[in-house]
């Protein structure tokens, strides 16, 4: 599946596959992954959005009995992606941590171990709304925290869509996009990469996150994640 960008503003997505989805923008190749991540092959850069580490701890602190283990599971998922794609740069498009109460001793220990496993990977956090409320991550986590939009090659890295104000091809998160599909008798909502007029919104990476159903407008499309398979939907479908 190719994302063809004939000018600075993206126009259309072509093709489909059951595994990884590749596209091109201004001579660069992007790969949508069924693990809810995006890989820029030439720059060996992995993008994710909305990890929400420590969300379960935040819920438990509020008296909601949510099981633990989601954060360590998600960090292991990230390790697999960084290793399998030999990434040298890791960009989080906002909301790495859920809130201030998420910074538990267990999360700190798990993230430090994760960082040690990937000590040679540059890690950039584009601050999202949850990151701003949670406060700065420990210095030992080794994150370069930046404000949006963060320019990286031809891309404007943001947390919230439209934060780049049309300055370039935008990569964003925040919305946790999903697409609702239905028959006459039943419906299903699946996470997706939402392709809009200014760029691409990534699905939430965190395993303990919700979804927001998007309605495709003319000219928009979605790369839908169904387990380990990806497929494309357009406004007309």
Model regions: which residues?
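Extended recognition/assembly regions associated with phosphoester-bond processing machinery
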Residues: 1-93, 98-237
